[in-house]
Amino acid sequence: MTSTTNTMCGSYYRNYNGGHGYGCCGYGGLGCGYGGCGYGCCGYGGLGFGYGGLDCGYGGLGCGYGSFCGCGYRGLDCGYGCGYGYVSHSFCGCGYRCGSGYGSSFGYYY
């Protein structure tokens, strides 16, 4: 994926080599997943939120503790106390204004 627009996951083309996952923040679609974000965070087989639904992780919209995607603990934004995510505001914590979180060595912070 070479698109530089912000998708539901905040996917940027830099994520492909920036440590955010295979195929620019998603193995099978727009979601964060399989190669770097971790399939425990944003899924790996659809629009990319959760194990098979439209939510990050397995707690709710933006959750996913232990993720590499920096998904927020609660809500549709990134947050502290969740994987590499610290402070940012995007749907899934990948790309726009997030990267993998503030002060993280696993990606970028936009």
Curated annotation (Swiss-Prot):
InterPro entries: KAP6. GO terms for biological process: keratinization. The keyword Cell division does not apply. Interacts with hair keratins. It comes from the Eukaryota. This is Keratin-associated protein 6-3. GO terms for cellular component: cytosol; intermediate filament. Belongs to the KRTAP type 6 family. Keywords: Keratin, Repeat. The keyword Repeat applies. In the hair cortex, hair keratin intermediate filaments are embedded in an interfilamentous matrix, consisting of hair keratin-associated proteins (KRTAP), which are essential for the formation of a rigid and resistant hair shaft through their extensive disulfide bond cross-linking with abundant cysteine residues of hair keratins. The matrix proteins include the high-sulfur and high-glycine-tyrosine keratins. Coiled coil: none annotated. The lineage of its organism: Eukaryota, Metazoa, Chordata, Craniata, Vertebrata.
